[in-house]
């Protein structure tokens, strides 16, 4: 165990970010705004939207062997960390489904059993933790969006958007990623941007700077903005 005085701590110049939205909203397209060289794992086959762009290396997850492919991708990313500025996993929602399907193939029913869900929860937390600890690398995760119902102390119920990750582990996952951003589109202007602060209808957080919203092309430009007078 290492001890350090808080005044000696320095804010990292690297970031870990999770972006989520409904399918087709532009999550994968956002990756083109990362600066530097990017290594990306395509879990859902949507990387074609990045065709022709420079400085992006894409590995494609084999849906028939997702567990080993994820382990191999981490091994490659760790070994070649000095060659890339960014590592992207696109997307966790589909990887979750592939993992459960893979582990259900050898059961009598051909479906994942109850124990597999708990094993996956542990696996996902461990996986994100080790990727977050890659040295000198920005890490970006994507996920589809889901909704959950929340009850206030007053008894009022409301629906909240959040990443489409298993309910029992999603809070933990969102807790260990400093930025969780929901991508939305303005229906009037067509402009896309990210919510970076939580409200009753959306889960979002930003522990890296004071921004509450960012245009799609500005998400990765980390830094405080001047407060309004």
Language model: regions and residue ranges:
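Conserved acidic residues
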Residues: 38, 85, 137-138, 178
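Phosphate-binding/switch region of NTP-binding enzymes
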Residues: 139-214
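Conserved P-loop
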Residues: 2-89, 93-98
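Alpha-helix C-terminal capping segments
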Residues: 30-35, 131-134, 222-225
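P-loop NTPase motor core
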Residues: 91-171
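Structured loop/turn residues at beta-strand edges in well-structured enzyme cores
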Residues: 82, 134-135, 175
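Charged phosphate-binding loop/patch that engages nucleotide di/tri-phosphates or the phosphate backbone
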Residues: 208-229
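Hydrophobic, Leu/Ile/Phe/Ala-enriched alpha-helical segments that form helix-helix packing faces
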Residues: 77, 128-132, 177
